[in-house]
């Protein structure tokens, strides 16, 4: 039957070969209808079926049995745990992080989450659009050549596996962004985070307001931690470092002390207390306490020996102030003798 109309069959084959050269347009439906109504279409289809059977082409039935990509599974689990994928849990740095750090971290994590979901949506739309186009194309071709439903699904599966590479890249880069974000907030060895300006002001005011004994009690540390929105251990570390810096750079420290003393004077309205922020100490004792807060004579039971260092000799730092203090002491002694 096939050999009785060679001219018609040759014409049909030429039409099929020209399909690859044609573009998709509104005339496709007319061309498809013309091909469907061609008298030799069924003959061509039978020949192609016979050829396919001779080549013994088999379709592997492993589409549904293929396990998920283990790398994708690990990335998905990590994104869910970090609060990027799945329900928004409001990521946390841990119980030891300050409130300011927590808020900043959540804000930046939310930005990563929004960007990730937007890119994932674009990826899924592109993948679905492409696979749907392949399904439609193969379904149309199945009218001319033998294509089983399993073969179409197999081709779609192969395309989806190709798209998985893009998905892995997206999720991998998102996980890296989350890890970099966490390292900025959690790894103090790589980046030291300074306190806020307000917290530093509060701590400095307490330090210079208690220069005679710059060792806050546990209750004072807890109160300062609440005011500064930091931990008690951070308060302890700050005071330890501050005492060391005060000793190493006494001139600058005395300027800071004068600044905070003037600031305190502006808020004090009780008689003689206004002129002396350390009015609890009389005369030269106040000056001596300001010049040397670590003087063991001023702080019973408190000296620098427990820190493994000798007492401070501050006369070398500011001889003018020391001379003024000695002069005041001499005047006080003269008044007592008279």
Swiss-Prot record:
Keywords: DNA-binding, Homeobox, Nucleus, Transcription, Transcription regulation. It comes from the Eukaryota. Residues 4-187 form the PBC domain. It holds the Pfam family Homeodomain. GO terms for molecular function: cis-regulatory region sequence-specific DNA binding; DNA binding; DNA-binding transcription factor activity, RNA polymerase II-specific; transcription coactivator binding. Changing residue 245 to H: In mu290; egg laying defects, abnormal migration of QR neuroblast lineage cells and BDU interneurons, and vulval protrusions. Loss of expression of dopamine pathway genes, including dopamine transporter dat-1, in midbody neurons (PDE). Residues 11-91 are annotated as: PBC-A. SMART domains: HOX (SM00389). Disruption phenotype: RNAi-mediated knockdown results in egg laying defects, abnormal migration of QR neuroblast lineage cells and vulval protrusions due to ectopic induction and defective morphogenesis of vulval precursors cells. RNAi-mediated knockdown results in the absence of the transcription factor, mls-2, in the M lineage. Changing residue 214 to L: In ay42; loss of dopamine transporter dat-1 expression in midbody neurons (PDE). Residues 188-250 bind DNA. It is found in: Nucleus. Residues 94-187 are annotated as: PBC-B. GO terms for biological process: animal organ morphogenesis; anterior/posterior pattern specification; dopaminergic neuron differentiation; embryonic organ development; mesoderm development; mesodermal cell fate specification; muscle cell differentiation; neuron development. PROSITE patterns: HOMEOBOX_1 (PS00027), HOMEOBOX_2 (PS50071), PBC (PS51978). PANTHER family: HOMEOBOX PROTEIN TRANSCRIPTION FACTORS (PTHR11850). Transcription factor that binds to the 5'-TGATNNAT(G/T)(G/A)-3' PBC/Hox lineage enhancer region of sem-2 to promote cell fate specification in the postembryonic mesoderm (also known as the M lineage). Required for the M lineage-specific expression of the transcription factor, mls-2. Required for asymmetric division of the T hypodermal cell, probably acting via the regulation of asymmetric expression of Meis protein psa-3 in concert with homeobox protein nob-1 and the Wnt-MAPK pathway. Belongs to the TALE/PBX homeobox family. Interacts with Meis protein psa-3. Interacts with homeobox protein nob-1. This is Homeobox protein ceh-20.
């Amino acid at each position: 039957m096939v050999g009785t109309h060679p001219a018609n069959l040759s014409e049909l084959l030429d039409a099929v070969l020209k399909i690859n050269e044609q573009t998709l347009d509104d005339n496709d439906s007319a061309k498809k209808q013309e091909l469907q109504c061609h008298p030799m279409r069924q003959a061509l289809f039978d020949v192609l079926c016979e050829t396919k059977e001779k080549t013994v082409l088999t379709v592997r039935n492993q589409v549904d049995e293929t396990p998920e990509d283990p790398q994708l599974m690990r990335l998905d689990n990590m994104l869910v745990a970090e609060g990027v994928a799945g329900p928004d849990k409001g990521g946390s740095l841990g119980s030891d992080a300050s409130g300011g750090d927590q808020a900043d971290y959540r804000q930046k994590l939310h930005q990563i989450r929004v960007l990730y979901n937007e890119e994932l949506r674009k990826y899924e739309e592109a993948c679905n659009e492409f696979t749907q186009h392949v399904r439609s194309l193969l379904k149309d071709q199945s009218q001319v050549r033998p294509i089983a439903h399993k073969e179409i699904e197999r081709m779609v599966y192969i395309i989806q596996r190709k798209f998985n590479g893009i998905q892995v890249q997206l999720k991998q880069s998102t996980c890296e962004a989350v890890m970099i974000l966490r390292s900025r907030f959690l790894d103090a060895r790589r980046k030291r985070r300074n306190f806020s300006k307000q917290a530093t002001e509060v701590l400095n005011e307490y330090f210079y307001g208690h220069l005679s004994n710059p060792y806050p009690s546990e209750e004072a540390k807890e109160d300062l931690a609440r005011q500064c929105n930091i931990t008690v251990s951070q308060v302890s570390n700050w005071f330890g470092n501050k005492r060391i810096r005060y000793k190493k750079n006494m001139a600058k420290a005395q300027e800071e002390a004068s600044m905070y003393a003037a600031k305190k004077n502006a808020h004090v309205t009780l008689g003689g207390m206004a002129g002396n922020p350390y009015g609890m100490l009389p005369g030269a004792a106040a000056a001596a306490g300001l010049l040397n807060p670590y003087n063991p004579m001023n702080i019973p039971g408190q000296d620098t020996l427990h820190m493994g260092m000798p007492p401070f000799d501050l006369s070398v730092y500011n001889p003018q102030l020391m001379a003024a203090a000695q002069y005041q002491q001499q005047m006080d002694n003269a008044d007592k003798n008279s």
